[in-house]
């Protein structure tokens, strides 16, 4: 089993890099984990709708180039399904049991998602209706993936 997290933008803060490193280490017991960072597109504060759309399209193209053919694609999306940690672990287990050997989680840029990403998604996941910095969403996602594996393996985990 391999999990890839493809995200727009690079982690800048040391504490976030340390958290990603820690969860990568923890996850290595259960799965191969790969983190892919693609460049975010420059976007001034005031953009027209067309310019905003162009930024999202360019970021989506960068992400889509990194998705391996045959990978089960999970898109983090505010319009996606909200679930519990137990529900997420059940979903992850079902994906693995149905023969998928590679899952790619996609975290879009700060302006949102291009339609091309929505079209390729096998599943759209909403971590929360609250807004988080994309870098923090990466850490939250990794923690939930780790928690899901602990649930699947019936191992205890601090609640």
From Swiss-Prot:
It catalyses: pseudouridine(1915) in 23S rRNA + S-adenosyl-L-methionine = N(3)-methylpseudouridine(1915) in 23S rRNA + S-adenosyl-L-homocysteine + H(+). Signal peptide: none annotated. GO terms for molecular function: rRNA (pseudouridine-N3-)-methyltransferase activity. CDD domains: RlmH-like. It is an enzyme of class 2 (transferase). Transmembrane segments: none annotated. Pfam families: SPOUT_MTase. Its main location: cytoplasm. S-adenosyl-L-methionine binds at residues 76, 108, 127-132. The keyword Zinc does not apply. GO terms for cellular component: cytoplasm. It comes from the Bacteria. The keyword DNA repair does not apply. Its EC number is 2.1.1.177. Keywords: Cytoplasm, Methyltransferase, rRNA processing, S-adenosyl-L-methionine, Transferase. It is found in: Cytoplasm. NCBIfam families: PRK00103.1-3 (NF000985). Belongs to the RNA methyltransferase RlmH family. HAMAP family: 23SrRNA_methyltr_H (MF_00658). Homodimer. PANTHER family: METHYLTRANSFERASE (PTHR33603), RIBOSOMAL RNA LARGE SUBUNIT METHYLTRANSFERASE H (PTHR33603:SF1). Specifically methylates the pseudouridine at position 1915 (m3Psi1915) in 23S rRNA. This is Ribosomal RNA large subunit methyltransferase H.
């Amino acid at each position: 089993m391999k999990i890839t997290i493809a995200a727009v933008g690079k982690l800048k803060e040391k504490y976030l890099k340390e958290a990603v490193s820690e969860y990568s280490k923890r996850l290595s017991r259960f799965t191969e984990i790969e983190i892919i960072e693609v460049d975010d597109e420059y976007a001034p504060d005031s953009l027209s709708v067309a310019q905003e759309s162009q930024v999202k399209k360019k970021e989506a193209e960068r992400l889509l180039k990194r998705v391996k053919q045959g990978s089960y694609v999970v898109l983090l999306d505010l319009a996606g399904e909200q679930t519990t940690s137990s529900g997420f672990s059940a979903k992850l287990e079902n994906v693995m049991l149905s023969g998928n050997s590679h899952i790619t989680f996609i975290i879009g840029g700060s302006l949102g998602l291009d339609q091309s990403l929505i079209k390729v998604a096998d599943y759209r996941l909403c971590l929360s209706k609250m807004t988080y910095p994309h870098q923090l969403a990466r850490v939250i996602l990794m923690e939930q993936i780790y928690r899901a594996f602990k649930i699947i393996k019936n191992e205890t985990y601090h609640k």
